[in-house]
Amino acid sequence: MTRALYFVLPLALMSQTPHHDPLYKRLQRLYFLSVQSATYLQPFEDTLQILAARYGPYPTIQMYRYGALALKARYATNLLKKKDYLYAAIASMDAQVARTPNDPEVRFLRGSFYYYLPFFLGKRKAAQDDIQTLVTLLETQTQDLTQLYDKEVLRAMADFIAQTGWVEETRVKKLRQRYSL
């Protein structure tokens, strides 16, 4: 009987969403810290590997994997590797958004990455589209999103939306009120 449990448990874990897993919360925090400092990149990647093994190719986990490529591009000193990481991140993120266009975290991750890219890479329109889609999702899926995400994550999304200047101030204010931020 115990042997059967060894096979069922991994399948049961993979069938659930990772959003309520404490390790997923750690992944989110490590990603934001990795954006600010390369010292967090390895712990972020280690956590990402554990979650990928636990949940399989879940869309947001895949997107964080592509975010890791973007971070490697940011911190790489070799220009050829930097270019390779950058273009791999862009292609992978575009493909993930095409597969899951209505996932707010997927849109947030790509939109925040593209926002900081130089204009000559031609990703400004995609970033604006991601932010507008994210706002619409936050406005229309309040109940679902408050169950999936901590206030800290929703606050980061709302703050970033405000920072872009691409969304009317009244909509940003309503978002912050809606999520009690």
Residue ranges and their predicted role:
Residues R65, K72, R110, A156-I161:
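Structural register within alpha-helical repeat arrays
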Residues S34-T47, K82-A91, K123, D130-I131:
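Helix-turn-helix repeat elements of alpha-solenoid scaffolds
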Residues D84, I90, G122-T140, R176-L181:
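TPR/TPR-like (Sel1-like) alpha-helical repeat modules
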Residues F32-V35, L71-L80, Y116-L121, G165:
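Short coil/turn linking the two alpha-helices of tandem helical-hairpin repeats
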Residues T140-L181:
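Terminal, low-structured helical/coil segments at or just beyond the last alpha-helical repeat
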